[in-house]
Curated annotation (Swiss-Prot):
Its cofactor is Zn(2+). Its EC number is 3.5.1.41. Induction: Up-regulated in response to 20-hydroxyecdysone (20E) and juvenile hormone analog. Also up-regulated in response to the transcription factors BRC-Z2 and POUM2. InterPro entries: CE4, Chitin-bd_dom, Chitin-bd_dom_sf, Glyco_hydro/deAcase_b/a-brl, LDL_receptor-like_sf, LDLR_class-A_CS, LDrepeatLR_classA_rpt, NODB_dom. PROSITE patterns: CHIT_BIND_II, LDLRA_1, LDLRA_2. The lineage of its organism: Eukaryota, Metazoa, Ecdysozoa, Arthropoda, Hexapoda. This is Chitin deacetylase 1. The gene is CDA1. Hydrolyzes the N-acetamido groups of N-acetyl-D-glucosamine residues in chitin. Disulfide bonds join C80-C93, C122-C134, C129-C147, C141-C156, C168-C180, C173-C178, C230-C489, C354-C361, C391-C397, C497-C520, C503-C523. One of its GO terms (molecular function) is chitin deacetylase activity. CDD domains: CE4_CDA_like_1 (cd10974), LDLa (cd00112). The keyword Membrane does not apply. Disruption phenotype: RNAi-mediated knockdown results in delayed pupation. Binding to the accessory protein CPAP3-A1 is essential for chitinase activity.
Length: 539
């Protein structure tokens, strides 16, 4: 029996030793695998920008749906939903037919300038290109490639542009010409929030024509009055094609603001991000020429810009706006925040991050006001619901499905402004969203009437009227007699013409199309376009 016991003990010891050996071998293999994984991860993530998505395998089908991203906690993978491919350049899922870069694994790698080196590479006032060539500092990030390798235009965000605007300096930035604050939430004039009139700006984008004129008449019917007794007002960002300029003329006569939204409304969003100063001038200053001529607007009141698709054009857009004497932009979106942001001038650095996918925000100092678009909170139950990304345009808040939901949405977002710093509340629309959803329109009109009846400190005003208040802050009591808010208070009389000229026109710039232009003025020779905004044929 003793012999069997010794054999059993020996067998147990051998098994234990084998188990130890297997354990050590498994740990060594695991360690080696971990090292290989870490090495592979380092290789994959080398030279990748923060937050950049890329493919492991290029090609059509599922390969074009799958991308990965390097994060602090390791590799993260996603797959686009069925029917969508991942657009490497746009860094987002898009419809299959719209994605043309399935064969690309990574975004195009751009050569970066040598801005940060242990020893200076250039003399004072000069900076180094990616190939170590020195050029003047002011040539960096000016919209033109001055380095042989183009690197002077490849590192131009707010953190890297060597000519970026300085942080807000309230001792230098003084009303009425300049307004800034460190976080963008300071009330102009340091008024207590309870003394600030709550401004609401309603805006509509795109053409004004027979598809939406009756909708606008229903909303702005002359019966809805601000506390000062004047009609409520809106701002229209007008694009050219299919616009009825006699209707624009009448809208302006009624005291609403007309602003520009481009001539072509170019469908390629990347165009607006990368357009030159000259491109922006033709689109926006040209659109102003068209509006002023064919709507007979002669009071220099067309001073606002909003880019199509809310694609910010960086320094080029704002340089054009300075050169063409535009007063304000309303394209830049601020992420959902509490409290909300007030309008600011672009002399100093933006008080919030550049928000949105692949946006190109301005980095330099510009003599332009920004009517920043505060994102709206689309949660149905803000006290319980999980965080949801905000939305800038009301019609992009995709979870609004019923009139009751829209009514609650309006009340919640109004309260977020009214009960905090009373930053202007922007409600930005495309007319079709209200026209095609009568339940939404009914809820909207009910809400406007309710707000006007229950508050004596809420004003529906234009974008320019907001800036006029920021430049010269007035309390709720003083607002009733604030002269800029009483212009065209309640307009009576007849339109400039009852039956406009219907001009069937063509243009070399729009080949193969005959387009109808309606105006109270005489018909031009050609359909107005980028190189011929007057339509007189002078290219």
């Amino acid at each position: 029996m003793a012999r069997y016991a010794r054999v059993a003990t020996l067998a147990a010891c051998l098994l234990f030793a084998c188990a130890l050996a297997d354990g050590h071998r498994w740990r060594r293999q695991a360690d080696e695998t971990a090292k290989k994984d870490e090495s592979l991860e380092q290789e994959l993530c080398k030279d990748k920008d923060a937050g950049e998505w890329f493919r492991l395998v290029a090609g059509e089908g599922d390969n074009c749906r799958d991308v990965i991203q390097c994060t602090a906690s390791g590799i993260q993978a996603i797959r686009c939903p069925a029917g969508l491919f991942f657009d490497i350049e746009k860094q987002t899922c898009d419809w299959k037919d719209a994605v043309k870069n399935c064969k690309l694994k990574n975004k195009e790698r751009k050569i970066k300038p040598l801005l940060y080196t242990e020893e200076p590479l250039c003399q004072d006032g000069f900076l180094a290109c990616g190939d170590s060539t020195c050029i003047e500092r002011g040539l960096f990030c000016n919209g033109e490639k001055d380095c042989g390798d183009g690197s002077d235009e490849n590192s131009c965000d707010i953190d890297n542009d060597p000519n970026r605007a300085p942080p807000c300096d309230s001792s230098q930035c003084v009303l009425p010409d300049c307004f800034c604050s460190e976080d963008g939430t300071v009330i102009p004039g340091d008024l207590p929030a309870r003394d600030v009139p709550q401004m609401i700006t309603i805006t509509f984008d795109d053409a004004i024509n027979n598809n939406n004129i009756e909708l606008y008449k229903e909303i702005f019917n002359g019966k809805r009055k601000n506390p000062n007794g004047c009609d409520i007002k809106a701002t229209y960002f007008v694009s050219h094609k299919y616009t009825n300029y006699s209707a624009v003329q009448e809208t302006h006569r009624k005291g609403h603001e007309i602003a520009v939204h481009s001539i072509t409304h170019n469908d390629d969003e990347r165009f607006w991000s990368n357009a030159t100063v000259d491109d922006w001038g033709k689109e926006m200053a040209g659109m102003r020429v068209i509006i002023e001529k064919f709507s007979n607007i002669t009071d220099n009141s067309v001073v606002g810009v909003r880019a199509p698709y809310l694609r910010v054009g960086g320094n080029n857009q704002f340089t054009m706006m300075e050169e063409q004497a535009f007063l304000y932009d309303s394209t830049i979106t601020a992420p959902l925040s509490n409290p909300r942001l007030c309008p600011y001038t672009m002399y100093f650095r933006m008080p919030h991050r550049c928000h949105g996918n692949l946006q190109s925000c301005p980095t330099r100092s510009h003599a332009v006001w920004e009517m920043v678009m505060n994102e709206l909170d689309r949660r149905e139950d803000p006290s319980n619901d999980e965080y949801l990304p905000g939305c800038a345009m009301v019609d992009s808040c995709s979870n609004i499905l019923t009139g009751d939901q829209f009514y609650n949405f309006l009340n919640h977002n109004f309260d977020r402004h009214y009960e905090q710093n009373r930053a202007p509340l922007g409600l930005y629309f495309h007319a079709a969203w209200l026209k095609n959803n009568p339940e939404f329109l009914e809820a909207f009109l009910y809400w406007i009437d309710e707000i006007l009846q229950s508050h004596n400190d809420v004003y529906f005003v234009t974008m320019t009227q907001v800036i006029q208040w920021v430049q010269n802050p007035r309390t709720v009591t003083e607002a009733k007699n604030f002269e800029p808010w009483r212009e065209k208070c309640s307009v009576e009389g007849n339109p400039a013409c009852w039956v406009p000229h219907s001009c069937k026109l063509t243009s070399k710039e729009v080949p193969g199309e005959t387009i109808n232009l309606q105006t109270c003025l005489r018909c031009p020779v050609n359909y107005p376009w980028l190189n011929d905004p007057t339509g007189d044929g002078h290219y």
